[in-house]
């Protein structure tokens, strides 16, 4: 019923509004074109065109079929290439999760541009997660590869890891915050008076990591690092921020860095992927990272030193 030739004939008639013009476009006779449409209407049991002596126009059913037919034809036309790609060991879909600390729209766009040029028939899905939410996606939600899992050891022996670097932290507040000009290390009693600005761990199955907050201290949860830094600049609260993301603001005296009794140690992050079952696209992404190629440099800018 919906063979490619019939679909092409239907689309041509719909686009030209004429059996004769469609026939001319398809290098067919008008009678052949008209008969193919008549047969299609008989097989579907609905009228697809309103006919006048000078032109034809789509019925509601015809309009619906037109919107679908173009997609079907595109799918049929691309299928041979898709099958060859699958036969060559290329995945049909690759799901990639990125740690919030490493996420950058420009970095994702750069990697996507590189991937799309090489794997035009693979569907790529990117997700942005926080702390243990990155491992959660890899372990339980069908993700193929993670950029920035916490730690340098896998949570399961079915994964491979490549250390990317360690995030250095600074404890900051706005330049006009009451604690900004206190001399010497701040005490817990001083810190507890002001809210801690944090981003909540996005883990759904694994245990969430608890961000810095003193017992009895008010906590304000924000969705991402951009909002957290904006909240610090606005004087809303205090907390730890990755040093590369706040150093310029510190140098401009918009934020102040202070020492507290328990400073946050560096956070090591790694690339992680499944040992088994991966395809060529994942293999190529891993190579980009292990070889520190420029296509993935945007993901690594948060590290003070990037391994060469």
UniProtKB/Swiss-Prot annotation:
Family per record: Belongs to the LysR transcriptional regulatory family.
A molecular function annotated in GO for this UniProt entry is: DNA binding
Protein's job: Positive regulator essential for the expression of allD operon. Binds to the allD promoter.
- Domain HTH lysR-type: where? 2-59
Write down the superkingdom of origin: Bacteria
InterPro entries cross-referenced by the UniProt entry: LTTR (IPR050176), LysR_subst-bd (IPR005119), Tscrpt_reg_HTH_LysR (IPR000847), WH-like_DNA-bd_sf (IPR036388), WH_DNA-bd_sf (IPR036390)
Per the record, DNA-binding region residues lie at: 19-38
What's the protein called, per UniProt? HTH-type transcriptional activator AllS
Taxonomic lineage: Bacteria, Pseudomonadati, Pseudomonadota, Gammaproteobacteria, Enterobacterales
**Keywords carried by this UniProt record:** Activator, DNA-binding, Transcription, Transcription regulation
| Gene3D superfamilies linked | 3.40.190.290, Winged helix-like DNA-binding domain superfamily/Winged helix DNA-binding domain
């Amino acid at each position: 019923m919906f063979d490619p030739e019939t679909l092409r004939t239907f689309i041509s008639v719909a686009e030209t509004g004429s059996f004769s013009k469609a026939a001319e476009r398809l290098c067919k006779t008008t009678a052949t074109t008209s008969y193919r449409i008549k047969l299609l209407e008989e097989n579907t049991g609905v009228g697809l065109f309103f006919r006048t002596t000078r032109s034809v126009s789509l019925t509601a059913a015809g309009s619906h079929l037109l919107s679908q037919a173009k997609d079907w034809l595109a799918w049929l036309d691309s299928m041979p290439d898709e099958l060859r790609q699958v036969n060559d060991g290329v995945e049909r879909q690759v799901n990639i999760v990125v740690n919030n600390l490493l996420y950058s729209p420009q970095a994702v766009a750069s990697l996507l541009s590189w991937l799309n040029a090489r794997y035009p028939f693979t569907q790529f899905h990117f997700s942005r997660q926080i702390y243990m939410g990155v491992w959660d996606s890899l372990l339980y939600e069908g993700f193929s590869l993670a950029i920035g899992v916490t730690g340098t050891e896998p949570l399961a022996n079915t994964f491979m890891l490549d250390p990317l670097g360690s995030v250095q932290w600074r404890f900051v507040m706005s330049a006009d915050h009451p604690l900004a000009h206190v001399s010497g290390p701040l005490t817990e009693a001083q810190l507890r008076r002001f809210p801690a600005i944090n981003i909540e761990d996005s883990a759904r199955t694994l245990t969430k990591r608890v961000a810095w907050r003193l017992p009895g201290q008010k906590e304000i949860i924000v969705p991402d690092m951009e909002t957290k830094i904006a909240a610090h600049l606005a004087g809303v609260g205090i907390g730890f921020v990755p040093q590369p993301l706040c150093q310029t603001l510190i140098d401009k005296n918009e934020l102040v860095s202070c020492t507290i009794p328990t400073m946050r140690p560096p956070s090591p992050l790694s690339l992680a992927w499944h040992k088994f079952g991966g395809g060529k696209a994942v293999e190529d992404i891993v190579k980009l990272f292990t070889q520190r190629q420029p296509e993935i440099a945007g993901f690594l800018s948060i590290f003070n030193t990037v391994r060469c």
